[in-house]
Amino acid sequence: MNHNQEFNAPFVEEEEEQSVSIRDIISKYIDHQKVVIIRRTKFDLAKDEKRVHILEGYKIAQDNIDEVIKIIKSAKSDDEAKINLMNRFGLDEIQSEAILELKLRRLTGLERDKIEAELAELLKEIEELKAILASEQKVLDIIKDELLEIKEK
Protein backbone atom coordinates (compact mmCIF):
# COMPACT_ATOMS: atom_id res chain seq x y z
CA MET A 1 0.00 0.00 0.00
CA ASN A 2 1.46 3.31 -1.05
CA HIS A 3 0.54 6.55 0.73
CA ASN A 4 1.52 10.03 -0.24
CA GLN A 5 0.92 12.75 2.25
CA GLU A 6 1.37 16.44 1.62
CA PHE A 7 3.52 18.26 4.12
CA ASN A 8 4.10 21.98 3.98
CA ALA A 9 6.78 23.35 6.28
CA PRO A 10 7.43 27.01 5.66
CA PHE A 11 10.69 28.30 7.09
CA VAL A 12 13.07 31.16 6.56
CA GLU A 13 16.47 30.51 5.10
CA GLU A 14 18.80 33.35 4.17
CA GLU A 15 16.01 35.92 4.74
CA GLU A 16 13.75 34.23 2.21
CA GLU A 17 10.69 32.19 3.11
CA GLN A 18 10.62 28.81 1.46
CA SER A 19 8.37 25.82 1.47
CA VAL A 20 10.24 22.54 1.63
CA SER A 21 9.46 18.87 1.56
CA ILE A 22 10.06 16.47 4.43
CA ARG A 23 12.96 15.04 2.41
CA ASP A 24 14.57 18.50 2.29
CA ILE A 25 14.07 18.96 6.03
CA ILE A 26 15.70 15.61 6.79
CA SER A 27 18.54 16.38 4.40
CA LYS A 28 19.17 19.77 6.03
CA TYR A 29 19.03 18.16 9.47
CA ILE A 30 21.59 15.52 8.49
CA ASP A 31 23.87 18.17 6.96
CA HIS A 32 23.63 20.20 10.17
CA GLN A 33 24.36 17.14 12.32
CA LYS A 34 27.42 16.36 10.19
CA VAL A 35 28.76 19.83 10.90
CA VAL A 36 28.02 19.45 14.63
CA ILE A 37 29.70 16.04 14.86
CA ILE A 38 32.77 17.14 12.92
CA ARG A 39 33.12 20.27 15.05
CA ARG A 40 32.70 18.26 18.26
CA THR A 41 35.19 15.63 17.07
CA LYS A 42 37.78 18.27 16.16
CA PHE A 43 37.33 19.88 19.58
CA ASP A 44 37.78 16.55 21.37
CA LEU A 45 40.79 15.72 19.21
CA ALA A 46 42.51 19.03 20.02
CA LYS A 47 41.79 18.58 23.74
CA ASP A 48 43.17 15.04 23.75
CA GLU A 49 46.27 16.04 21.78
CA LYS A 50 47.01 18.82 24.29
CA ARG A 51 46.68 16.39 27.18
CA VAL A 52 48.94 13.82 25.46
CA HIS A 53 51.53 16.56 24.97
CA ILE A 54 51.55 17.32 28.71
CA LEU A 55 51.62 13.64 29.67
CA GLU A 56 54.62 13.10 27.41
CA GLY A 57 56.37 15.88 29.33
CA TYR A 58 55.45 14.21 32.64
CA LYS A 59 56.87 10.95 31.36
CA ILE A 60 60.17 12.62 30.50
CA ALA A 61 60.23 14.17 33.98
CA GLN A 62 59.60 10.79 35.62
CA ASP A 63 62.31 9.10 33.55
CA ASN A 64 64.79 11.77 34.63
CA ILE A 65 63.41 12.70 38.04
CA ASP A 66 66.74 13.17 39.81
CA GLU A 67 68.03 15.52 37.14
CA VAL A 68 64.71 17.41 36.96
CA ILE A 69 64.80 18.02 40.72
CA LYS A 70 68.44 19.12 40.51
CA ILE A 71 67.61 21.60 37.71
CA ILE A 72 64.66 23.01 39.65
CA LYS A 73 66.62 23.28 42.91
CA SER A 74 69.59 25.01 41.29
CA ALA A 75 67.47 27.56 39.39
CA LYS A 76 67.18 31.06 40.82
CA SER A 77 63.67 31.60 39.43
CA ASP A 78 60.74 29.80 37.87
CA ASP A 79 61.67 31.18 34.46
CA GLU A 80 65.24 29.94 34.77
CA ALA A 81 64.02 26.48 35.80
CA LYS A 82 61.61 26.41 32.87
CA ILE A 83 64.29 27.43 30.38
CA ASN A 84 66.77 24.92 31.79
CA LEU A 85 64.19 22.10 31.54
CA MET A 86 63.41 23.10 27.97
CA ASN A 87 67.07 23.15 27.00
CA ARG A 88 68.04 19.94 28.75
CA PHE A 89 65.12 17.70 27.73
CA GLY A 90 63.84 19.31 24.54
CA LEU A 91 60.55 20.24 26.18
CA ASP A 92 58.46 23.17 25.06
CA GLU A 93 57.14 25.94 27.30
CA ILE A 94 53.80 24.24 27.97
CA GLN A 95 55.44 20.98 29.06
CA SER A 96 58.05 22.75 31.21
CA GLU A 97 55.38 24.84 32.90
CA ALA A 98 53.29 21.73 33.57
CA ILE A 99 56.30 19.97 35.13
CA LEU A 100 56.99 22.96 37.38
CA GLU A 101 53.34 22.94 38.53
CA LEU A 102 53.44 19.18 39.10
CA LYS A 103 53.03 17.99 42.68
CA LEU A 104 55.82 15.65 43.74
CA ARG A 105 53.34 12.91 44.66
CA ARG A 106 52.50 12.60 40.95
CA LEU A 107 56.01 11.23 40.43
CA THR A 108 55.49 8.05 42.45
CA GLY A 109 55.50 4.64 40.78
CA LEU A 110 51.72 4.32 41.11
CA GLU A 111 51.18 7.68 39.45
CA ARG A 112 53.60 6.65 36.70
CA ASP A 113 51.33 3.70 35.90
CA LYS A 114 48.30 6.01 35.87
CA ILE A 115 50.03 8.44 33.52
CA GLU A 116 51.06 5.64 31.16
CA ALA A 117 47.53 4.19 31.22
CA GLU A 118 45.97 7.60 30.54
CA LEU A 119 48.46 8.21 27.74
CA ALA A 120 47.65 4.86 26.10
CA GLU A 121 43.90 5.51 26.42
CA LEU A 122 44.21 8.99 24.92
CA LEU A 123 46.31 7.76 22.01
CA LYS A 124 43.64 5.15 21.25
CA GLU A 125 40.90 7.78 21.47
CA ILE A 126 42.87 10.11 19.17
CA GLU A 127 43.11 7.32 16.62
CA GLU A 128 39.32 6.83 16.80
CA LEU A 129 38.63 10.56 16.47
CA LYS A 130 40.89 10.80 13.41
CA ALA A 131 39.06 7.82 11.90
CA ILE A 132 35.74 9.62 12.38
CA LEU A 133 37.06 12.74 10.68
CA ALA A 134 38.38 10.65 7.78
CA SER A 135 35.12 8.77 7.13
CA GLU A 136 31.76 10.27 6.24
CA GLN A 137 30.19 6.86 6.88
CA LYS A 138 31.40 6.95 10.49
CA VAL A 139 29.84 10.40 10.88
CA LEU A 140 26.55 9.07 9.48
CA ASP A 141 26.75 6.09 11.86
CA ILE A 142 27.12 8.50 14.79
CA ILE A 143 24.06 10.45 13.60
CA LYS A 144 22.11 7.19 13.38
CA ASP A 145 23.22 6.10 16.87
CA GLU A 146 22.34 9.48 18.38
CA LEU A 147 18.89 9.40 16.74
CA LEU A 148 18.30 5.89 18.11
CA GLU A 149 19.27 7.14 21.58
CA ILE A 150 16.74 9.95 21.29
CA LYS A 151 14.09 7.49 20.15
CA GLU A 152 14.72 5.24 23.18
CA LYS A 153 14.29 8.13 25.59
Predicted regions and their residues:
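C-terminal interaction appendages of subunits in large macromolecular complexes
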Residues: 1-153
